[in-house]
Amino acid sequence: MIQRAEQFSPNSVEKDLAILEAVAQRLRLQGHEVTMQSEAALAQGRQPDFIFSMARHPEILAILKFFSIPIVNAPAGTQNCARSTLETIMTRIGTPMPPREGNDGYWLKRGDAAAQERGDVVFAADRAALDAAIEGMRRRGIEKYVVSAHVKGDLVKFYGVAGTGFFRCFYPTDDGQTKFGDEQRNGAAHHYAYDVASLQQEAERLAAAVGIAVYGGDCIVRADGSFCLIDFNDWPSFSRCREEAADAIASLVKVRR
């Protein structure tokens, strides 16, 4: 099992490690031999039969591509979660997405990798602020980025394990858990009614297109019940539903062999 490097777990190091350890515990109870290692020290020597990986570092993903064993999440799928690539996939398969233009501000997100610090996801109140934020990213050497209009509605976080039936949704403003505080931008949840099964269907379809099994993301549910996906990630921490998620993830050993 490969832990995620701290640079790719902003404000979530302990939570990310906790879900991996929970899965490892279940695998050991099933009789599997499990070893845990850091992303920065990919083990040398005997090749395992199966890898559960939270790795995100480009060099590690490149190495994992040469392994001829099942890997969850697959390195190519994890690479596809870079926002520029992800946006292309979402557009191609028709995933509900926020518009590019609007009257309520914009979101600018680095496009070459998952967010590693607060400045990788920026809210801009207007076009002038957006231009300034883009220039700020360029000064940091980030040339790939995505822009979307802010969408009013309930922010809903979802978590899933493809092919297992596991899918859970939560309102982050209800429990106050946050990574960078951006969840507050949409305000307290109104708990608008929406079709959870439809959201799961869209999430599973996107997971298949991206090429990952363990996923999470964010969506906005509008007052009329329609929704759009605003984020999609490989292997989140599942901190709101860790025990259930660990059961589902551990079951992938049988499904993927």
Residues of each region from the PLM?
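Phosphate-binding site of ATP-dependent enzymes
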Residues: A124-V210
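A short glycine-rich, hydrophobically flanked beta-strand micro-motif that places a catalytic Asp/Glu
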Residues: S38-E39, Y145, V156, I212-D224
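A short beta-strand motif that forms the metal-chelation/ATP-contact edge
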Residues: P48-F52, K109, F158-G160, G225-F238
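C-terminal active-site "lid" helix and adjoining low-complexity regulatory extension at the edge
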Residues: A208-I212, V221-R257
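Anionic group-transfer/hydrolysis microenvironments
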Residues: G111, H150-V151, Y159, D218-I220, ...
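Short acidic-hydrophobic, aromatic-tinged amphipathic segments that line or gate anion-handling sites
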Residues: R100-E101, V122-D126
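Conserved N-proximal alpha/beta basic substrate-recognition cap immediately N-terminal to
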Residues: Q3-P99, A114
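A short linear hydrophobic-aromatic micro-motif
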Residues: M97, Y106-W107, E143-V147, V214-G217
